[in-house]
Amino acid sequence: MKEHDLINMEGIVTESLPNAMFRVFLDNGCHVLTHISGKIRRNYIRILPGDRVKVELSIYDLTKGRILYRIRNEASKDTL
């Protein structure tokens, strides 16, 4: 995929699913099914429900995405 075929958004992890999958509630009000990126997996970054994350979505399927970055809790003031 090309760089301009992707949409970056922020959201809150609402549910942790098996196989490093997560359900994320985006800022625009949509729920998406996401998986974690390779760098997050390689660096053992733990993502828990309630964490604020940056998500990358494809313009071809807006129901699935990839978690790129976990925003630290001190910087995040949002709650479920």
From Swiss-Prot:
Belongs to the IF-1 family. PANTHER family: TRANSLATION INITIATION FACTOR IF-1, CHLOROPLASTIC. Residues 1-72 form the S1-like domain. Component of the 30S ribosomal translation pre-initiation complex which assembles on the 30S ribosome in the order IF-2 and IF-3, IF-1 and N-formylmethionyl-tRNA(fMet); mRNA recruitment can occur at any time during PIC assembly. The keyword tRNA-binding does not apply. Pfam families: eIF-1a. PROSITE patterns: S1_IF1_TYPE (PS50832). One of its GO terms (molecular function) is rRNA binding. The lineage of its organism: Eukaryota, Viridiplantae, Streptophyta, Embryophyta, Tracheophyta. One of the essential components for the initiation of protein synthesis. Stabilizes the binding of IF-2 and IF-3 on the 30S subunit to which N-formylmethionyl-tRNA(fMet) subsequently binds. Helps modulate mRNA selection, yielding the 30S pre-initiation complex (PIC). Upon addition of the 50S ribosomal subunit IF-1, IF-2 and IF-3 are released leaving the mature 70S translation initiation complex. Keywords: Chloroplast, Initiation factor, Plastid, Protein biosynthesis, RNA-binding, rRNA-binding. It is found in: Plastid, Chloroplast. This is Translation initiation factor IF-1, chloroplastic. One of its GO terms (cellular component) is chloroplast. It comes from the Eukaryota. InterPro entries: NA-bd_OB-fold, RNA-binding_domain_S1_IF1, TIF_IF1. The keyword Repressor does not apply.
